[in-house]
Amino acid sequence: MINALKGMKDLQDDQATLYEKVVKTCEEVAKNYGFTFINCPHLELTKLFKRSVGESSDIVGKEMYEFVDKAGNDVCLRPEGTAGVVRSYIEAKMDKNQSVKRWFYHGSMFRYERPQKGRLREFHQFGVESFGVESVYEDASIILMLDEIFKRLKIHTNLKINSLGCKECMGVYKEKLIAFLNSKDGFCEDCLRRKELNPIRVLDCKNDHCQNLIKNAPKLSENLCPCCKKDYEKLQKILSENGIEFECDEKLVRGLDYYSKSAFEFISDEIGAKAAVAGGGRYDRLIEYLDGKSGYGVGFAMGIERIMAILEQKQDIKKRNGIYLCAMDEAYIDTIFKLANTLRKKHKVYLSYEAKKLAKHLNQADNANAKIFLCIGEDEMQKEEIFYKNLDTKENKNIKIANLENEL
């Protein structure tokens, strides 16, 4: 038997329904904020991610599905969504006149890492990207959008924010941080690599020993230039005035190298240990990194599997819906086929083409998770009626077929 690859799984039935619910909720909120859908390829040139995500990131260092294709191109399956959307923005020459574009996307991402709860090798993300807007109000708007999504999904989260500064103040901060890191010994292998490539990523280490080593590290907030400090304070003011609770976290740097200025994460403890379920920030330099004209960008990405894991614990995803329509005699199949065609204009209909006894039909309706059971037998046909049963309330009665739409 051929099985799915390790860390990759099918979405079927209840899981597929839950996936659709999460994506639909995200899409509805994103559209209300003026965002439109973009769909980018799953396969891109590897250099796109080496330039954008950064050589110091775990993704580029050890997690990419990378290979050489038949034409000799070094390509990889996308490990995240932002770089591809930025590439699309530049390729369409929208960067030349700083076009304002607001896009949302969703789909598969791929990382070769150890599979665990809420973390797969093929996983799904929902994300948004906004281009051409410098104002910190856009950063706040992106955060408010995510907050609204979680409210609609009834998921409790905690928001953490930070400012990574711009190129100028980050340069000063890195010098102080490097001096501090060089005075410490005992970092893990990942931190030793990060220290050489991008020292600020050491702050992102989840190793308890490393966290203890850096507990007195220089603070980003104390090294921001006046402009970045003003924007960070303004962001906090906007969030507070709009009823958004948050925590300022000096060690929040995100796992990708392209962030600058605003960075944020939404944390939930409803998946077990506190884990990030969404995060993002501003990446004004990324467009320039990818050979575009220097501009503005901000966005977020959400891990759909982690959201689904929370909802599975909180909600009854097997809530009944739809109509199961059947007949007890083959002579009436044509009748229910025509009736199904009419009902499907407004309702979800499961149609059985086989004539069976009532008990067997009821069993199939239960397996289909239908809410309404409709069946025609000889007696019903003679009276131009149909047998109706609500599988939630167990109410049952005969209804005139001509009045069926009004009764449903």
From Swiss-Prot:
It catalyses: tRNA(His) + L-histidine + ATP = L-histidyl-tRNA(His) + AMP + diphosphate + H(+). CDD domains: HisRS-like_core. The keyword Aminoacyl-tRNA synthetase applies. InterPro entries: aa-tRNA-synth_II (IPR006195), aa-tRNA-synth_II/BPL/LPL (IPR045864), Anticodon-bd (IPR004154), Anticodon-bd_dom_sf (IPR036621), His-tRNA-ligase (IPR015807), HisRS-like_core (IPR041715), HisRS/HisZ (IPR004516). Keywords: Aminoacyl-tRNA synthetase, ATP-binding, Cytoplasm, Ligase, Nucleotide-binding, Protein biosynthesis. The keyword Ligase applies. Pfam families: HGTP_anticodon, tRNA-synt_His. It is found in: Cytoplasm. Its EC number is 6.1.1.21. GO terms for molecular function: ATP binding; histidine-tRNA ligase activity. GO terms for biological process: histidyl-tRNA aminoacylation. One of its GO terms (cellular component) is cytoplasm. Homodimer. Belongs to the class-II aminoacyl-tRNA synthetase family. This is Histidine--tRNA ligase. It comes from Campylobacter lari (strain RM2100 / D67 / ATCC BAA-1060).
